[in-house]
Amino acid sequence: MVADLAQEALDIMRKAADKYAATGVADHEAMTMAQMKSGLTMQLLNHSRAASGAEHLMAHLVEMQPPRFENAEGIHGECVGVGTFACIKEYHRLASLPTPKAKPFEPLSEAWIREKFGDRLAPGIIKENENDVLATFDPQNIVDHWDEIRAMINELPSVEEAEALYKGCNA
């Protein structure tokens, strides 16, 4: 049910983006409906994972302004858009690789977190990751389901399709 609702939200938003790219006319009603359905998926799961992923992590990185990113700027949606394009490129690159080997989860060290995020952000990041869900994930699942993962990635727009859509939307 939640996956279907998330897909429905995505389909509505993609259709609105295609319309905007073709006509320059924004379908605010459709975009609002897509956002509401996306929000509902989060409510149903009591978590934002249904509507956000790695692309949002990139946006949050810009918003947090860690060392070396102090001058980064952009509104959340812009950053998510850039993150989405970067993720599409990386996902397609990964899908072109042979089946990976399972590698056990290794949490980031406190020293690494402090080095990358600085004293201002490190305590919150360390606390947020105390019970990292990845520690409960069996990496063999990726190996066992690699063909299915590739198939899902191949349902994403190609890098060229995404680039054309972004250009059509003046993004």
Spans of model-derived segments:
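Carboxylate- and glycine-rich phosphate/diphosphate-binding segment that chelates Mg2+/Mn2+
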Residues: M1-S52
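Short amphipathic alpha-helical segments and their helix-coil junctions
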Residues: I12-A21, M58-F69
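Short glycine/serine- and small hydrophobic-enriched flexible loop segments
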Residues: K15, L40, E63-P67, F85-R93
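Flexible, glycine/charged-enriched surface loops at secondary-structure junctions
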Residues: A22-M31, S48-S52, F69-E78, A95-K103
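Alpha/beta-hydrolase fold catalytic core
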Residues: A34, S52, L57, E63-P66, ...
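Short, flexible active-site loops
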Residues: T41-L44, Q65-E73, G124-N131, W146
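Conserved phosphate/anionic-ligand binding catalytic regions in large, soluble enzymes, centered on
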Residues: S48-L61, H76-A86
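Mobile late-domain/C-terminal helix-loop "cap" segments
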Residues: A86-A171
